[in-house]
Amino acid sequence: MERGKIWRNGYAAAGCISRPKDYLSLSFEMIAAAMEGKRLGLCQKSLFAVPNHLTEQWASEFLRLYPSANILVASKKDFEPANRKKFCARIATGNYDAVIMGHSQFEKIPMSKERQERLLEEQIEEITDGIAELKESRAERFTIKELERTKKNLQVKLEKLQAEGKKDNVVTFEELGVDRLYVDEAHSFKNAFIYTKMRNVAGLSTTDSQKSADILMKCRYLDEITGNRGIVFATGTPVSNSMTEMYTMMRYLQRDTLDKKHLNHFDAWASTFGETTTAIELAPEGYALIGR
């Protein structure tokens, strides 16, 4: 085990990505960081979001390292509709050193309606400004239409959310008392929504996934309550296919830095740290000019 990593993840915890030598040392580093963080008063309750099939393994390793730790481990039954509220209430009211749950269970704990609405409104405003810029510069009609379609989809989502009444029987993520989040296999959340005016560039993905939107909101909330010191990601492959994945990781872990440097929009980030090049590459239909 590396003491430096434990200190960084436990004390600094300003959006670290842990790159493990092996899986056991990874879990021990994160567990020790969480417990040291609590011992030093840097956090009160840590939540571990891990792959669904590894929850029991993580619990076993936690107790192996800290036999007297007070941990709560989610089972499949705990997140059945009839039991979910009760389990979340246990998290909120219990003085646990750590809570361990699977990725899919983590997604089932919603953020407050107000926070969800705020994120959608920000995305709609961003796209509206982008469409206006494109119309001014007389960009391709196809590009504008595509953005208008994305905007409409987000507006439908927002209207649906606003039409829902307040659900009194739901415990939100903010109510759990969690102030430190550890995410194992964090590359599973790489497809967060990205607005960009770039088109026809290979490897540029603007797909969105609900689980990525959900964790982005949770990361922003933790940044607010901890001063950007509440999130630790663990993955061996933070970037696998596209540069957008690097930007996405920075949005999760270094939002404050992106804001300070005025790089919170992908196009500004890409123009600072990269460049688009065109080369002849082999495509299914033969050789073609591909932008990257």
Regions found by a protein language model. Name each.
Residues E56-L65, K86, R90, P110, ...:
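Short amphipathic alpha-helical segment within the helicase RecA-like ATPase core
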Residues R64, S68-I71, K76-K77, E121-E146, ...:
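Conserved P-loop NTPase motor "coupling/switch" region that bridges the ATPase
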Residues A14-K21, F28-N70, D223-I231:
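Conserved SF1/SF2 helicase motif Ia
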Residues P81-V99:
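Conserved motor-coupling elements within RecA-like helicase/translocase cores
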Residues M1-L24, F28-A32, F189, M198, ...:
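Conserved pre-motif I regulatory segment
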Residues D184-E185:
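Walker B catalytic acidic pair
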Residues V73-K85, G102-K108, D208-S212:
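Conserved helicase motor
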Residues G10-A14, S68, A89-T93, L120, ...:
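Short basic/glycine-enriched coil/helix segment immediately N-terminal to the Walker B
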